Design a protein with these regions (language model features):
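N-terminal intrinsically disordered, cationic/polar leader segments
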Residues: 1-32, 46-116
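Gly/Ser/Thr-rich active-site loops/lids in small-molecule metabolic enzymes
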Residues: 33-39
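Alpha-helical support elements that line or immediately flank enzyme active sites
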Residues: 39, 43-47
């Protein structure tokens, strides 16, 4: 099971992706899901790095290893909506995968004290 958690607490985004695609047909659906989860994670990290290079983040950290990705990002005031838009697009991708591969991926999270 792959777990995707996306949270926003007081304007600081936390994204955690963990696990592997487990299913009875690993040579087909498992590989497709795994590749899809990975490319969304890599895309997320790169688009946030691009925002960081443009001076749009107060803080950014990432961990990427086998079976786990963790990203923490705190935007500058002027880039809050840009960061949120990038994360929402990636979240939509994960939600589509959750519908396509029920029981193999779970997407969750919460937003606390979010300012827009």
């Amino acid at each position: 099971m792959t777990q995707v958690t996306i949270k926003n607490e007081d304007g600081i985004w936390g994204i955690h992706i963990s696990g592997h695609a487990e299913n009875p047909y690993p040579e087909t659906q498992g590989n497709l899901l795994c590749a899809s989860v990975s490319i969304l994670a890599y895309t997320l990290m790169q688009t946030i790095r691009d925002l960081e290079e443009d001076g749009g983040l107060k803080r950014y950290s990432e961990v990427c290893k086998d079976g786990e990705v963790q990203v923490i990002a705190e935007p500058e005031y002027w880039s809050e909506s840009q960061l949120e838009a990038k994360i929402e697009v990636i979240k939509t991708g994960y939600e589509l995968l959750e519908r396509q591969f029920p029981g193999m991926i779970r997407v969750g999270g919460e937003m606390k004290n979010k300012t827009v």
